[in-house]
Curated annotation (Swiss-Prot):
Record keyword Cell membrane present: no
The protein's role, per its UniProt record: Required for the assembly and/or stability of the 40S ribosomal subunit. Required for the processing of the 20S rRNA-precursor to mature 18S rRNA in a late step of the maturation of 40S ribosomal subunits.
Native organism: Paracoccidioides brasiliensis (strain Pb03)
Location(s) in or outside the cell: Cytoplasm
GO BP terms: ribosomal small subunit assembly; translation
Database matches in Pfam families: 40S_SA_C (PF16122), Ribosomal_S2 (PF00318)
Protein name: Small ribosomal subunit protein uS2
Keyword line: Cytoplasm, Ribonucleoprotein, Ribosomal protein
GO molecular function, one term: structural constituent of ribosome
Keyword Repeat attributed: no
Family: Belongs to the universal ribosomal protein uS2 family.
GO CC terms: cytosolic small ribosomal subunit
Length: 295
């Protein structure tokens, strides 16, 4: 990392640098825009352009100082048409008081005063100059300064402050917005000092797939845990001695169980059957013996 041109109080800590590297904020694309060349550290053998993390931190601090200089936070508009940045801009707006536009940017928001969504911000911050080009173009018509998260292949036309970073990864985008919000709160005095940790974790700024979260909840509700299955088995008496107690002792010991005679069974067979068959025989023989019966 190149030596920093910031005052010592704004220097990045080793933890900040480790977080930027872990989120892959230093990995750009294979294409290089000529205006992004000053932020380039080197090009890897596979063609990936590596961004200078020191320049990234300097631009984060510069952007935070610009944001903190605006008296009314509602005059700041944060924009992200890229899905990976929509959750981040909403969290940034909630923590700093800015106005968020997550999703499609309606043309005419900054130029057509007849529309309901007309806004007159003093500063806009975009996640990607390529996907948010409509907002940058309209800001140039009405002289609104623009801060943008720029990759090595991002167009920098009409961008006043470019924060060099990877603006295509979900973790890189979330981390940059989280660091920007933290620096703004430090400059405003919301956080006591730079040594105090922010109680908001960076995971809140990361993109979450709604379908993946829904499927995860369904799986958790369908599959019971091992502890629940064990508890249910114990309560139903199917574990340990209870299972043997419920089973027949004779079968468990492997000894044949002698049959129990039913009282009166043989007597019923010998008497009842003979008694019931005698009248039937007589009734069958009577018609043949009687000559008066006509068939």
């Amino acid at each position: 990392m190149a030596p920093s041109n910031l005052p010592p109080v704004f220097n990045a800590t080793s933890q900040d640098i480790e977080m930027l590297l872990a989120a892959q904020c230093h990995l750009g694309s294979k294409n290089l825009q000529v205006h992004m060349e000053p932020y380039l550290w080197k090009t890897r053998p596979d063609g990936i352009n590596v961004i200078n993390i020191g320049k990234t931190w300097e631009k984060i601090v510069l952007a935070a100082r610009i944001i903190a200089a605006i008296d009314n936070p509602a005059d700041i508009c944060v924009i992200s048409a890229r899905p990976y940045g929509q959750r981040a801009v909403l969290k940034f707006a909630a923590h700093t008081g800015a106005v968020a536009i997550a999703g499609r940017f309606t043309p005419g928001n900054f130029t057509n005063y007849i529309t309901r969504s007309f806004k007159e911000p003093r500063l806009i911050i975009v996640t990607d100059p390529r996907t948010d080009s409509q907002a940058i173009k309209e800001a140039s018509y009405v002289n609104i300064p623009v801060i943008a998260l720029c990759d090595t292949d991002s167009p920098t036309e009409f961008v006043d402050v470019a924060i060099p970073t990877n603006n295509k990864g979900r973790h890189a985008i979330g981390l940059i917005w989280w660091m920007l919000a933290r620096e703004v709160l430090r400059l405003r005095g919301t956080l006591a000092n730079r040594e105090s940790e922010w109680d908001v974790v960076v995971d809140l700024y990361f993109y979450r797939d709604p379908e993946a979260e829904e499927n995860k909840e369904i799986e958790e509700t369908k599959v019971p845990g091992a502890e629940e299955v064990g508890a249910a088995a114990i309560e139903s008496g199917l574990v340990g001695d209870s299972w043997q107690a419920q089973a027949t002792p004779g079968f468990s010991a492997g000894v044949a169980v002698p049959g129990t005679a039913v009282p009166g069974w043989e007597a019923d067979v010998s008497t009842d059957w003979a008694a019931s068959s005698a009248p039937a025989a007589e009734t069958l023989a009577d018609p043949a013996a009687d000559p008066s019966v006509k068939w």
